[in-house]
Amino acid sequence: MKYLRMLFDNFTLALLGVVFIATVLPCSGDGAVYFGWLTNLAIGLLFFLHGAKLSREAIIAGAGHWRLHLLVFSCTFVLFPLLGLAFKPLFVPLVGNELYLGVLYLCALPATVQSAIAFTSLARGNVPAAICSAAASSLLGIFLTPLLVMMLLGASGDTGSGLDAVLKITLQLLVPFVAGQIARRWIGAWVKRNARWLKVVDQGSILLVVYTAFSEAVVTGLWHTVSPQHLAGLFVVCGILLAVVLFGTRLLGKALGFDLEDRITILFAGSKKSLATGVPMAQVLFVGSGIGAMILPLMLFHQIQLMVCAVLAQRYASREQVAQEASAAS
């Protein structure tokens, strides 16, 4: 648990460092063009590795639990977007219109894979089902997120072409992902052996995209349009979203008769939003416009969900350990 937290903390510090560097030394002009091409290559590599790491056998092992998966997908792609729209009268005064669009983008994203599985495992939930749900959510997000973004931002007066977005996502994200899945039969063992180094590549790709995005945002005046009050309000907004979804997933899991292991999986898989997918996807979806404000809510939500879910997972694990000790004593 301490090692897991250390990794997340180091990556969070790196994210903050990259935002600071982009604020002080943003890339612009020819440098921005160079970083743009480099970012596109990094995004392709990131999704190629996602495809190469994803085990089809693990997905098949947990695929039969369709009621659980349906509930997780509903929380990810229905509950979150509905909350984003329903809370608009509360959220806009807290964060302003620009950051609110970023909150809506956050609500449209798929679940994260790695942390959902890690926390489910730590809390002693249904790990095969968590792997299947999180992986399928990530894949569905390639198609559903652009459409949800079109509907959500259209409802807020910022429309776009959903078909064009899906085409861009397909070419820049899905094609490398499928190529990675195909290549898995030859490089799967190598990927597994070098998982630690490939994690660095994953995170490095995300940091590069964040630097490029925030450089563009700083050049176009992000910190002049986003006030300290709105940043403080963003903490409140992300906390409200996470609290409502955590409460909702727990309540629905109980009401629908799932056992404890499945309820743990629903809680952790249904409440996550993927930074690894959301940052590069924003670079594709919002090309030509400053995306710093679009990914800022996601970056903050990412850290809050890790801290809160780490505490929850530890509590579930402690309760399970106490139950096992009591059973052994009797």
Model-derived features with residue positions:
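Structural signature of multi-pass alpha-helical membrane transport proteins
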Residues: 1-91, 150, 154-260, 320, ...
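Helix-helix packing/entry segments at the starts of transmembrane helices
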Residues: 195-201, 257-274, 280-281
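Helix-loop junctions at the membrane interface of multi-pass solute transporters
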Residues: 61, 114-126, 224, 251-255, ...
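Membrane-embedded alpha-helical segments of transport systems
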Residues: 75-83, 108-113, 130-150, 170-174, ...
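Membrane-interface helix-loop-helix junctions at boundaries between adjacent transmembrane segments
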Residues: 88-144, 149, 153-165
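Extracellular/periplasmic helix-loop-helix junctions in multi-pass membrane proteins
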Residues: 30, 221-228, 281-299
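Transmembrane alpha-helical segments of integral membrane proteins
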Residues: 53-54, 277-284
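The feature identifies polytopic integral membrane transport proteins across all domains of life
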Residues: 66-73, 94-108, 125-135, 232-235, ...
